[in-house]
């Protein structure tokens, strides 16, 4: 086993990478509230795992979506647990994200030279809210349907571009199959990809600049 490790160590310098990760300086003022961002990341990873598991059974059509969710909850092995964990971790992710934003703001973590870290964090907060909006509609029950209808109808108040924007969100002039397909694609592919990219940027900047000092 040691020969295998030595072979990889010689080529990749694994020990040097591990030392760099574990030897990062942590300021003495850091407390449990500085862990909120990491907890948010953990919730996101749980979301990815449980969401991926549900894609094996969920059917993104207006005629089968609700029935497929019922199947997950009542027939699929541990489906009820997987969906419940998905919902609980979604709520936890939103809560931890809000608390994290407040902590950073109140401790001045957005100030120079960490402005870009703050910007990427705000973008991640918007993406988190978008997860909630798109995921809420996927069961395609009465609550989900009317939530989509209201949310996609909001931009109509914008002059000139309002109506085209509503049609772009819905995929047609009314809420239907095209809308569900769009929201499913956003929820399972576009938003996770964007979130992963901005999280990588966010954590890379934190690693580079370190944790902000006390007020």
Curated annotation (Swiss-Prot):
Q: What PROSITE patterns does the record point to?
A: CYTB_NTER
Q: Where along this sequence does the record place binding of heme c? A: 35
List the Pfam families: Cytochrome_B
The record's Gene Ontology cellular component field reads:
chloroplast thylakoid membrane
Q: Which UniProt keywords apply?
A: Chloroplast, Electron transport, Heme, Iron, Membrane, Metal-binding, Photosynthesis, Plastid, Thylakoid, Transmembrane, Transmembrane helix, Transport
Asked whether the keyword Membrane is assigned, the reply is yes
Compartmental location: Plastid, Chloroplast thylakoid membrane
Q: Where are the transmembrane segments?
A: 32-52, 90-110, 116-136, 186-206
Names of required cofactors = heme b; heme c
How does the record say this protein sits in the membrane?
Multi-pass membrane protein
Major subcellular site: plastid
What note does UniProt attach to the cofactor annotation?
Binds 2 heme b groups non-covalently with two histidine residues as axial ligands.
- Gene Ontology terms: biological process: photosynthesis; respiratory electron transport chain
Domain of life assignment: Eukaryota
Entry GO MF terms: electron transporter, transferring electrons within cytochrome b6/f complex of photosystem II activity; metal ion binding; oxidoreductase activity
In which residues is heme b 2 bound? 86, 187
- Give the quaternary structure: The 4 large subunits of the cytochrome b6-f complex are cytochrome b6, subunit IV (17 kDa polypeptide, PetD), cytochrome f and the Rieske protein, while the 4 small subunits are PetG, PetL, PetM and PetN. The complex functions as a dimer.
Q: What job does the chain carry out?
A: Component of the cytochrome b6-f complex, which mediates electron transfer between photosystem II (PSII) and photosystem I (PSI), cyclic electron flow around PSI, and state transitions.
* Further information: Heme 1 (or BH or b566) is high-potential and absorbs at about 566 nm, and heme 2 (or BL or b562) is low-potential and absorbs at about 562 nm.
Q: Family per UniProt?
A: Belongs to the cytochrome b family. PetB subfamily.
Entry protein name: Cytochrome b6
- Which organism encodes this protein? Piper cenocladum
Q: Lineage in the entry?
A: Eukaryota, Viridiplantae, Streptophyta, Embryophyta, Tracheophyta
